[in-house]
Amino acid sequence: MSTSRLYTLVLVLQPQRVLLGMKKRGFGAGRWNGFGGKVQEGETIEDGAKRELLEESGLSVDTLHKVGHISFEFVGSPELMDVHIFSADHVHGTPTESEEMRPQWFQLDQIPFADLWPDDSYWFPLLLQKKKFCGHFKFQDQDTILSYSLREVDSF
């Protein structure tokens, strides 16, 4: 890996449900995911997460809770994706479809894991248990995990 790029991912969690967005275009199109993207130059990771949540879902948030940090490697790509994962429980506004994402609430026992990124089934249970985690996933392509490591951490 020659370079890495900072990304954010925000999961809006409320009692018994989570807000996911159907990615409509670009990388990961056709999958449900949290809200996030690239951190822009001059922006903190948390500010980038808040901006992406607002742009993609129409929701604003006062407080984010950092819950995870995962690096993603894709065979053939020189760039490592350095993803900082946050949860938000109190948001302002109503989820609104954007050019990039179509938000939808899911009951926690009905999360569509078959239509999420394959790695989500490994770390999402930790998120729902309010545990913090770090990891690395190596993908052959967007559907195939070659190897991974994942561990709980006490704090960031």
UniProtKB/Swiss-Prot annotation:
Principal place of residence: cytoplasm
Cofactor(s) required for function per UniProt: Mg(2+)
A GO cellular-component term linked to this record: mitochondrial matrix
Single GO biological process annotation from the record: DNA protection
Catalytic activity, EC: 3.6.1.56, 3.6.1.-
InterPro entries attached to this UniProt entry: 8ODP, Nudix_hydrolase, NUDIX_hydrolase-like_dom_sf, NUDIX_hydrolase_CS, NUDIX_hydrolase_dom
UniProt-listed PROSITE patterns: NUDIX, NUDIX_BOX
Motif stretch (Nudix box): 37-58
Family: Belongs to the Nudix hydrolase family.
Protein's name in the database: Oxidized purine nucleoside triphosphate hydrolase
Protein's organism: Mus musculus
Lineage, broadest ranks: Eukaryota, Metazoa, Chordata, Craniata, Vertebrata
